[in-house]
Every structure is written in C-alpha cells, then in structure tokens.
C-alpha cells in the first residue's frame, strides 16, 4: 500500500529480487534566498571622495527641491549622510554659490506668512537655525499696520464662536496669542472687533 507524504525510508530491489531498505535523505535547502521576492541588493557606497561628493551634492539638490530649507537644516541632513565634515561644508558652499540655498530668502518667505504674528515668526526662525542678526533684520521689515489688520481679520472671522464663551475677551486673547501676536496688537484688535459685534447681535 503506498504511503502518502514524505517517507523516512525508501526501498530498492536487490539483484536477487529481494527488497533492501534504504534510508531517505531529504534534499538540503539552499541558504541562498529564492530569486522571487528577493530583496534588492543595497547600492554600494561610493568609494572615492569625488563619488562621495557627487552623491552628497545630488542628495542636497533633492532636499532643496522639496522645500526651501535653511543652512542649518540642510547641514543636519547632510551630516546624517556623511561623516566627513569637510565634505559637508564643501557641498553646502556649492549649493549656496549656485543660488539654491539662501537663508535670507527663507527668512523673507517665513515673514510673509499670513495669519501669524511677529512672535510666532521669531520663534519659527530661531527653531530653523537662523542667526539673531538675520532674524532682527527680517522682523524690522514687518509692517505694524498690516500686522494689526491681520489680527483684526482673524478675530472678526472667529468672533461669533468666541462670543459664546464664558469670557469672550479672554478667549479672543488666547486665540491671537497662540498665533504669535503680542499684547500691543491683541488688545486693540479685541476692542475694535467687539464694537462690530454688539452682545445681542453676537448671540443671534
């Protein structure tokens, strides 16, 4: 009777017609992974300094192509790719010479963001690694009247909801403070917007 499945023993016939037991030896599995589903081999790390430079420069261009980043942010990315500080600085200087990275442009773009006050911009520029001198120079270009109007516009849109709070003025102050506006901007905005929405009108 045939036996299903793998058998630990096989048989063969002798020259005289008898049956001799033969131990079954399973095939050894290859330690080499199958080609199907096999992971792609990792690319070899560039060996020469020039190859490393070209690879790091290409990575810098990709990083700068995604979004405008500061020198400090780009340096951090490059340092995670290369352990050669001289090579990192060389690549940084190169992308700056070509005009692909400029901290002043990044600061100006951040300063033009609408809906945030001077304090938020200052905090963001510091977090992104810009120097104190550049931050001060950037913030001096802000228009105080424009900042005041932005605070008023934000509060006007939000006032119907804020007016239903237990203390509308305190809620309005917190709302604008979270967006980086200072007290000298917030209080005038609250007074002006509160006059636009009388209590009976705000409740409707």
From Swiss-Prot:
Its main location: cytoplasm. It is found in: Cytoplasm. GO terms for biological process: regulation of DNA repair. InterPro entries: RecX_HTH_3rd, Regulatory_RecX, WH-like_DNA-bd_sf. It comes from the Bacteria. Keywords: Cytoplasm. Residues 39-51 have a biased composition (Basic and acidic residues). The keyword Acetylation does not apply. One of its GO terms (cellular component) is cytoplasm. Residues 1-51 are annotated as: Disordered. Belongs to the RecX family. Modulates RecA activity. NCBIfam families: PRK14137.1. This is Regulatory protein RecX. The gene is recX.
């Amino acid at each position: 009777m045939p036996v299903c499945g793998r058998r630990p023993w096989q048989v063969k016939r002798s020259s005289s017609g008898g049956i001799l037991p033969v131990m079954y030896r399973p095939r050894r599995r290859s330690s080499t992974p199958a080609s199907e589903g096999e992971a792609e081999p990792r690319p070899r790390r560039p060996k020469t300094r020039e190859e490393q430079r070209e690879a790091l420069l290409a990575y810098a261009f990709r990083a700068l192509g995604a979004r405008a980043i500061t020198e400090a942010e780009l340096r951090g990315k490059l340092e995670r790719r290369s352990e050669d500080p001289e090579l990192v600085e060389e690549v940084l200087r190169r992308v700056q010479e070509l005009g692909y990275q400029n901290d002043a442009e990044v600061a100006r773009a951040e300063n033009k963001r609408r809906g945030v006050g001077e304090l938020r911009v200052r905090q963001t520029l510091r977090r992104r690694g810009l120097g104190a001198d550049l931050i001060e120079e950037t913030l001096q270009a802000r228009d105080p009247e424009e900042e005041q109007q932005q605070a008023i516009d934000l509060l006007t849109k939000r006032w119907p909801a804020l007016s239903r709070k237990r203390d509308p003025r305190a809620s309005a102050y917190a709302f604008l403070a979270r967006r980086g506006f200072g007290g000298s901007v917030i209080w005038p905005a609250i007074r002006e917007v509160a006059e636009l929405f009388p209590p009976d009108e705000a409740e409707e």
